[in-house]
Amino acid sequence: MRMSAWPRTLTKSWRWHASRIFACASSVRPAAQAIRASKSYMEPKHSELHSSVDRIGRVIDQHLNVFHIETALNNRMFDGPLAFLGKREEDFTDFDRAALAGLRWTLQRTPRALRQNVFHKVPAAYGLIACAAGRTELTHEKILQACRRQLFVKVRGQADILIAGIPYISPYNVNSILNPLLVQVMACGYFFNMNRGVPLVKKGGTLIVTHPCMDEFDPVQHPSYIEFFHRLLPETRDAMTLHMKYEREFAQNPSYVHLYRKGNAYHGAHPFYMWYWGENGRQHLGQIIAVGTENTHVPELMGWERADTLAEAIDMARGRQGRSAGITLMHHPPMVMTEVALAGGDGLRQLPEHGGASAAKPGIAAKEQP
């Protein structure tokens, strides 16, 4: 969470300052190019996206007196009767196991709309674990340190097959539907990139996700997503082609502009950025399989395969990766980021970029706050 306090009175030289800022912004690569040039989204030193934003921020800091305030929250998505959902299954008590069985029984018999409504109303137990203030980049680094202590988990070796369950929520569907494009961005954009150094799955590996992939969109929040998914993806899935051929059309569409300004809709160009955000995952992975999909056309439009059960998906993945393929399950919640140690000539080696993670369990607020 980032916030900057701007000066109350802007000087007469503001126009010159603004021209410098906008000149810097205009030199930023298009998102599709910046993402392709990024080794990782979550490592600032390896991300062209971070470099672009930092460059703009430095220009602003040079000409304006910015006081930056930034905070970090804990990782507790569930509290109270649902707190057990944030545990590892091997840590479950008998009561937790009974609660999980009862929850699954209830959800299987509850209409989807009601399930979504109930879960969106369940409050998270978020709390402050760090607060820093001062100069922009120094403040941001303090908060990154707190996030690393909370999120990083050490893993030995990359997987041939990675399994991840897609949740009902993302940053872009609060009180709304997780539509197919958002399923894609969670799988190939967020979960795939939740790592430091190297991805959790090998180059050319298989990602198995579990989600019904229903062909449902919210016309109030995501109107341009509908056209993007059903009109553009049947033509091409190439991010650069989509950017060059269609992004400006969607950004300037009068209807989408009106809904963005006057309604509750995301910007008309927003679905493009959701597709770009999955670019690194699509380029790295050799196979993506969706388990339990309600249809065949949604995964096909995204270039995915489908399976009815997890066992079937694992068999399909082993057919590509080999019968001895290593399998890793990415467990959510809580949210984690992995530090993968690779086997080298002198044992295991860690790809360095930041200091190591603390021994604190993921999902527990770091005790040493910056």
Predicted regions and their residues:
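Conserved, well-structured core segments that form the ligand-binding/active-site neighborhood
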Residues: 1-158, 165-168, 189-193, 197-201
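C-terminal catalytic subdomain
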Residues: 183-288
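Flexible loop/turn segments at secondary-structure boundaries
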Residues: 75-79, 169-173, 215-219, 296-299, ...
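A short, acidic, amphipathic alpha-helical segment used as a generic capping/interface helix at domain edges
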Residues: 138-154, 189-197, 263-282, 308-320
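Extended hydrophobic packing segments that form well-structured cores
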Residues: 82, 89-90, 275-356, 361-370
